[in-house]
């Protein structure tokens, strides 16, 4: 099976070590999906794992959510771009100077790594935001941070399916929307609060859909990934 155009499905390799991550990758088709490497796996397995995933034909989203002083984040983003990853991300809460430094660092590197900003984590709800000093509904914070990311020269934002449509309406299709919290109908919620099915996420305007446990914990990960990729393609 193949899908038209570049794959929009991103499979989250949320594993504690390289061996199970690579075993899962061996069952997947790079024509159907990209792969996401997060903090735990990257800390344990390092850039060498990313290089091995590249050798299998996969494009990699390096999901490390950098948030530090501008110079430090710029250096980290430059290193990610030099590694050849498809996408890297930062926290929009790092502020304009940090976001601009990150965007400039990626733009100056060889190749074309996309850079996106995390707005509000999908594990956060209004009560959680209030605890950290961000009063109001998550949607308001997401839109404010998405605008900051766009003004700072980033390619897109990481947002929940709930806010994707509002971001598109306000900022246009040119700002990519990368969406975790995607679950097929009937799947367990896990630690996500603001979720949607793949078809609903596409209908909301999401460009890239990140799916983890519904694929990685499936009895047949290849079949699960193919089914979700087909649902995404059918939805638009």
UniProtKB/Swiss-Prot annotation:
InterPro entries: Aldolase_TIM, OMPdecase, OMPdecase_AS, OMPdecase_bac, OMPdeCOase_dom, RibuloseP-bd_barrel. GO terms for cellular component: cytosol. One of its GO terms (biological process) is 'de novo' pyrimidine nucleobase biosynthetic process. The active site is at 65 (proton donor). The keyword Lyase applies. It is an enzyme of class 4 (lyase). The keyword Ribosomal protein does not apply. Its EC number is 4.1.1.23. One of its GO terms (molecular function) is orotidine-5'-phosphate decarboxylase activity. It catalyses: orotidine 5'-phosphate + H(+) = UMP + CO2. Substrate binds at residues 14, 36, 63-72, 122, 183, 192, 212-213. Keywords: Decarboxylase, Lyase, Pyrimidine biosynthesis. CDD domains: OMP_decarboxylase_like (cd04725). Belongs to the OMP decarboxylase family. Type 1 subfamily. NCBIfam families: PRK00230.1, pyrF. Homodimer. Catalyzes the decarboxylation of orotidine 5'-monophosphate (OMP) to uridine 5'-monophosphate (UMP). This is Orotidine 5'-phosphate decarboxylase. It comes from Halorhodospira halophila (strain DSM 244 / SL1).
């Amino acid at each position: 099976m193949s899908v038209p155009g570049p794959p929009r499905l991103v499979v989250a390799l949320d594993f504690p070590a390289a061996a199970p991550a690579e075993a899962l990758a061996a069952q997947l088709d790079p024509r159907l999906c990209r792969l996401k490497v997060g903090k735990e796996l990257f800390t344990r397995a390092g850039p060498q794992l990313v290089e091995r995933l590249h050798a299998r034909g996969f494009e990699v989203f390096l999901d490390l959510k950098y948030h530090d002083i501008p110079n430090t984040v710029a250096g980290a983003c430059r290193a990610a771009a030099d590694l050849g990853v498809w996408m890297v991300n930062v926290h929009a809460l790092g502020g304009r100077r940090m976001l601009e430094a990150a965007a400039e660092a990626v733009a100056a590197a060889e190749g074309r790594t996309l850079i996106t900003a995390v707005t509000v984590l999908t594990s956060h709800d209004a009560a959680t935001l209030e605890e950290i000093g961000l009063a109001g509904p998550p949607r308001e914070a997401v839109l404010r941070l998405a605008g900051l990311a766009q003004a700072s020269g980033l390619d897109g934002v990481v947002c929940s399916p709930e806010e994707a449509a509002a971001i598109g309406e306000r900022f246009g299709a040119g700002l990519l929307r990368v969406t975790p919290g995607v679950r097929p109908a009937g799947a367990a919620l896990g630690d996500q609060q603001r979720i949607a099915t793949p078809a609903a996420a596409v209908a909301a305007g999401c460009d890239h859909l990140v799916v983890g446990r519904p694929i990685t914990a499936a009895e047949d990960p290849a079949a699960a990934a193919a089914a979700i990729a087909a649902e995404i393609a059918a939805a638009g």
